Design a protein with these regions (language model features):
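Intrinsically disordered, low-complexity regions enriched in Pro/Ser/Thr
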Residues: 2-14, 19, 23, 139, ...
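A short, exposed loop/beta-hairpin motif centered on an aromatic-Gly-Thr core
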Residues: 107-116
């Protein structure tokens, strides 16, 4: 990859796709546009969902999202103020070039969120207003029905999370 400024680094589409395929199955993967840069949607062979660079969310959105979904720590290779590599979930890391005169490169953790299509997607859409082009079309066609369905799915997700937390309490 070309060096990218660390200050405004967002994972590229190709890496987001690899991350999605490592989680939801490789082969036959398709993607849909979303309403925000740094947010990707993939449908993979086994499942699918949103892959979201934490840098694409505001601090307030991250706080709300993290009440329900935990970020996945990926590793980026940083040299000076530039990202020069990303640890790939399939190939791991290889072929990264760096310039010794810029100082030693170091691995840093970079948070990425995965919102599975069957459940967690409602968290992202409810908290942020981010949509796929398909969902945006549904919302534009009938905003009231779309919002009502989204709210219902979000509440179901929160209720299920609470039940799991209660079930995990030792008796």
């Amino acid at each position: 990859m070309k060096p990218a400024p660390l200050a405004n680094f967002l994972i590229p589409h190709s890496f987001a796709r690899n991350l999605a395929e490592s989680r939801w199955g490789r082969g036959g993967t398709s993607s849909d546009h979303t309403t925000r840069h740094g947010v990707f949607y993939f449908s993979c062979s086994g499942h699918g969902g949103y892959v979201v660079d934490a840098g694409a969310l505001t601090p307030e959105e991250r706080t709300e999202v993290e009440k329900i979904v935990t970020a996945e720590p990926i590793r980026i290779l940083v040299q000076g103020d530039a990202v020069i590599g990303i640890s790939n979930p399939f190939t791991h890391t290889r072929g990264i070039k760096y310039k010794t005169h810029l100082g030693p490169p170091e691995w840093q953790v970079h948070p990425v969120y995965l919102f599975e299509e069957d459940c967690d997607w409602a968290v992202l859409e409810h908290v942020t207003g981010i949509r796929t082009s398909w969902a945006k079309g549904r919302e534009d066609k009938d905003p009231e029905a779309f919002v009502a369905d989204l709210e219902r799915r979000f509440e179901e997700l929160v209720a299920a999370k609470r039940r799991r937390e209660v079930d995990a309490i030792p008796q």
